[in-house]
Amino acid sequence: MKALDEPPYLTVGTDVSAKYRGAFCEAKIKTAKRLVKVKVTFRHDSSTVEVQDDHIKGPLKVGAIVEVKNLDGAYQEAVINKLTDASWYTVVFDDGDEKTLRRSSLCLKGERHFAESETLDQLPLTNPEHFGTPVIGKKTNRGRRSNHIPEEESSSSSSDDDEDDRKQTDELLGKVVCVDYISLDKKKALWFPALVVCPDCSDEIAVKKDNILVRSFKDGKFTSVPRKDVHEITSDTAPKPDAVLKQAFDQALEFHKSRTIPANWKTELKEDSSSSEAEEEEEEEDDEKEKEDNSSEEEEEIEPFPEERENFLQQLYKFMEDRGTPINKRPVLGYRNLNLFKLFRLVHKLGGFDNIESGAVWKQVYQDLGIPVLNSAAGYNVKCAYKKYLYGFEEYCRSANIDFQMALPEKVLNKPCKDCENKEIKVKEESDAEIKEVNVEDSKNMIPKEETPAEDESERKENIKPSLGSKKGLLECIPAQSDQEKEANITKLEEKESLEDKDGATARAEEALSTEVDAEEEQARSGYDEWIKADKIVRPADKNVPKIKHRKKIKNKLDKEKDRDEKYSPKNCKLRRLSKSPFQSNPSPEMVSKLDLADAKNSDTGHIKSIEITSILNGLQASESSAEDSEQEEERCAQDPESSSKDESKVEHSAHSRSELISKEELSSPSLLEENKVHPDLVIAKTVSKSPERLRKDVEAISEDTDFEEEDEITKKRKDVKKDTTDKALKPQTKTWGKDRYCIQTNCLQSGSPGKKEDRTKSKEPLCTGNSSNSSSDEDEEEKSKAKMTPTKKYNGLEEKRKSLRTTSFYSGFSEVAEKRIKLLNNSDERLQNNRAKDRKDVWSSIQGQWPKKTLKELFSDSDTEAAASPPHAAPDEGTVEESLQTVAEEESCSPNMELEKPLPTSVDSKPVEEKPLEVSDRKTEFPSSGSNSVLNTPPTTPESPSSVTVTETSQQQSSVTVSVPLPPNQEEVRSIKSETDSTIEVDSVVGELQDLQSEGNSSPAGFNASVSSSSSNQPEPEHPEKACTGQKRVKDTQGVGSSSKKQKRSHKATVVNNKKKGKGTNSSDSEDLSAGESVTKTQAIKSVPTGMKTHNSKSPARIQSPGKCGKNGDKDPDLKEPSNRLPKVYKWSFQMSDLENMTSAERISILQEKLQEIRKHYLSLKSEVASIDRRRKRLKKKERESAATSSSSSSPSSSSITAAVMLTLAEPSMSSASQNGMSVECR
């Protein structure tokens, strides 16, 4: 506060520097109102009082011995501890201003400017080595304890005496002593045993000169006692204790001998301290186990010496309580419970608090505590925490030579060792944990019971447990075999199991495969799971922020899963490649026979398998699907015995033809084209290599089975369509939708009626032909993205993709909802489709068994995803989607069970869908509602070109026949994302919109016509300019909605959301064009259908969305979105899993990060694009509304506008996929 030579108070006339407006100016004291407070300690009893200076005789100087006037008026000797000048001074400045100030605002003239020791000689220029040193001396400590400095200095002016005292005190430190004191009545001399401790133990107790700090064995309290009153105790010289002191004295002797801590120096840790500490440690363990951070270390550190920790805390808490600073709340640091024991050991290892000078060391201590460093103050915070809680205890332990002898001797002495041990243990534990994880994953591979992906694990556990037996058998067989063999064997085993167990075995086999792949995935994932962060995942700016956030979460999960899938998809790719050669080369006779057998048996279990696959695709677990299968079968039988029998006959018929086709295909496997020819159903899925004619032939061959029961099938097909819609929605593969729809429509048309088939076929041929190349390129791209995005597991990778997506499954909750809805839809669809699905699935499964997944992916990429459920159905799904919407609306109101019964829209659906599309197309003709016509009008282009986006719909529909394959990756992504997230988010919006569509379909075929028109893009219907306009609108909507392939999910959701928000009319410009009445009808229908639709929605959120939006515009939109999804595959951020396979984990990470950076950059550019796109979309919508009446005859302008809109959409998707750079440029 003041320099030592400053007077205790200032006198009038003193020249000072006084603070005036923040600056010190020369002034002179004019008047002084003196008030000097003096803190003194009486020498006779060491009591401290504060008095005014007028009660003191003697020099007012710290450390001076003076006489102080007592309350009774007597003077007693005392030592001045502290002087405080509380006087008020009125000063006059040179200009005459007066101001009244406290002493703190004054300083003696010049003192502030030239400290005593500073002279001009030491200025930097003349004293270079002092360069940089401030001329003014360092400020004295201005803290609360600043007064101790002068006090100590002055009192230690007689340094010799003080040094002697200190030496004596140091000698006494840690000694057991007896402290003499006089009772309050001064009649009796008393004593108590105590332990001399370091004065630094307590800031609260001021230890005066000649005093020492002791801790009493009697009550554990800390007191400052005069040095002269302390006598060392030895067993010989100890005074005789009385009864009161007996226990304390014994404890003191015990401590003297063996350093045994007295019981009253410990505290029973209170519930909130000890148990809370234990709990907190458990919490820490939980938190840190999750992170596998230091908590495991802490626990490991603590567990070897639990009693030590307890002993330490008992003593610490008691120590803090006795010195007057109890720890009432659990110490917290960095939002974590602070492990004081660990902190104490860490600091001890570093030599104690006083030896740690660097903040970096403290920061390391902070990190060693396992607390995440949240800011730059971490080191300071831990230092303060240590000083607050442990520094006094450290000094106490040091001075008392307390090594926590109960168990802490090791702890304190061996703290470093313990730390090292603990650290080693931690490292070992962490490595062990990793090894264990790997082993567990391996064991999971071996024992499908354990689902490798953590996400899958929970879902799979349900399925796995029942399937353990069969899986174990499978797995036991598998380990010795090569991966190819494993896959082949697993497929065979799965087929056999499905034959044997129908319901459960297939699921088990699939799970076994999935577990293997998952295990590999997990291992692969383990390296990269965490590096993809939400902030790194680029998403288009969306108006629906909350949903976007939700999607972001889901998307992040999906992306992670994608990475995982990619990580293990390399394996899948490898497996596919490995199996590819055998597959392409003629499959082994065993495989063929097995496949044929499986097909034959699968004809029975085909629907089950399809259900399983569908359920898997939809996110249903195999076990659930198997259970559902039986239920669905029962329901089917109960609900539709006739149709089911018909279906069965159909299924049997198709199954036989399929098995024949399969065998043929196996023989002809070398060429995909041959395969396509041989296997119409598969061809539909594989359509990549098929020519339109072949597709037609295949479709016709397939439809021939259904022709005889066209009417029943139409009904069933509608149901199937519902299911397909659901499945499609689940398989939101955008491209596949369009293509599938096209295929479905053509197939449906063909199967619907020969004449219609022929017509459709004719229209189909040009489209297919035009699009086959597109679809092929799309397929290639999609295959790449598929490899990327979805690990294809046994069943076309669909099951696994879905599983992985499911696993990724944004949330098991979503998957469950989706599963439930899927179950309902699947059951109804499965009934009709079971037969065909059986046939196709049998064929499919046999094909899967024979062909490498990669080949299947290439052939069926789109179909694969969809074909995985049912190769042919993939196409029908789209057409079916719309119709199934109708049917769903109808059937949902009629019988959700029917939907439930409908297994997969798989191959069965394609036929019904084909028929339905005919109907739908007819309705479409009635309704100009869908922009698909304009899309149809637009010349087919490769889906990748912007116009091809428009056409992509067409080509998608066509190439969905030809190339349903490419879509799967994105679709699956979208599907899984949507099926689960969307199922939740979109379920509402989609439900509404599907219901709208359904209600439209029910109330007016217009809604379906719109969807159908988009779905049956085969029929270029320039008839309705409105359709063209709506197509454009849809394209725009699609742009807005499905603006991103990655974000397709998001875009779909956005579309649904937008539809909801816009009133279903806004997004679906067609809806607007159609009429408010239709919207009303939709709303009503929605109300009636909501449950069923929700099921559909959850099942196929993406698809439903597209129906919702695309029901009128939606279908087109989905197609466009799907193309958008396809397109992303080509972009610079797309890559092949096979490439990733060959990389090291570090390379993979760096590459993925590079891709993310590119995507981010693209995203930022797209972000601005989106705004302009939105504006354009609004303008286009306006124009479309205006020109809807005028341009009804001109479909080409609308198609061109649609193309533009598609380009915009692509640009928007490029936002999401960032893969549409060219598209976005075009849009710009």
UniProtKB/Swiss-Prot annotation:
Gene3D superfamilies: 2.30.30.140, ARID DNA-binding domain. Residues 306-398 form the ARID domain. One of its GO terms (biological process) is positive regulation of transcription by RNA polymerase II. One of its GO terms (cellular component) is nucleus. Residues 546-555, 1046-1064 have a biased composition (Basic residues). The modification Phosphothreonine is found at residues 706, 942, 1066. Residues 744-753, 927-937 have a biased composition (Polar residues). Residues 123-167, 266-307, 437-466, 479-525, 539-606, 620-802, 825-1129, 1168-1204 are annotated as: Disordered. InterPro entries: ARID/SWI1_ChromRemod (IPR051232), ARID4A/B_PWWP (IPR012603), ARID4B_ARID/BRIGHT (IPR028853), ARID_dom (IPR001606), ARID_dom_sf (IPR036431), Tudor (IPR002999), Tudor_ARID4B_rpt1 (IPR047476), Tudor_ARID4B_rpt2 (IPR047474). Residues 944-965, 1003-1017, 1188-1204 have a biased composition (Low complexity). There is a cross-link at residues 428, 461, 664 (Glycyl lysine isopeptide (Lys-Gly) (interchain with G-Cter in SUMO2)). Keywords: Chromatin regulator, Coiled coil, DNA-binding, Isopeptide bond, Nucleus, Phosphoprotein, Transcription, Transcription regulation, Ubl conjugation. The modification Phosphoserine is found at residues 276, 295-296, 482, 579, 581, 588, 630, 691, 703, 930, 945, 1068-1069, 1071, 1075. Residues 1141-1186 form a coiled coil. It is found in: Nucleus. Residues 437-464, 483-511, 556-569, 596-606, 635-667, 691-700, 721-730, 755-765, 825-843, 911-926, 972-981, 1112-1124 have a biased composition (Basic and acidic residues). Residues 277-305, 701-713 have a biased composition (Acidic residues). One of its GO terms (molecular function) is DNA binding. Acts as a transcriptional repressor. May function in the assembly and/or enzymatic activity of the Sin3A corepressor complex or in mediating interactions between the complex and other regulatory complexes. Plays a role in the regulation of epigenetic modifications at the PWS/AS imprinting center near the SNRPN promoter, where it might function as part of a complex with RB1 and ARID4A. Involved in spermatogenesis, together with ARID4A, where it functions as a transcriptional coactivator for AR (androgen receptor) and enhances expression of genes required for sperm maturation. Component of a Sin3A corepressor complex consisting of SIN3A, SAP130, SUDS3/SAP45, SAP180, HDAC1 and HDAC2. Interacts with ARID4A. Interacts with AR. The C-terminus mediates interaction with mSin3A corepressor complex. The N-terminus is involved in transcriptional repression by HDAC-independent mechanisms. This is AT-rich interactive domain-containing protein 4B. It comes from Rattus norvegicus (Rat). The lineage of its organism: Eukaryota, Metazoa, Chordata, Craniata, Vertebrata. The gene is Arid4b.
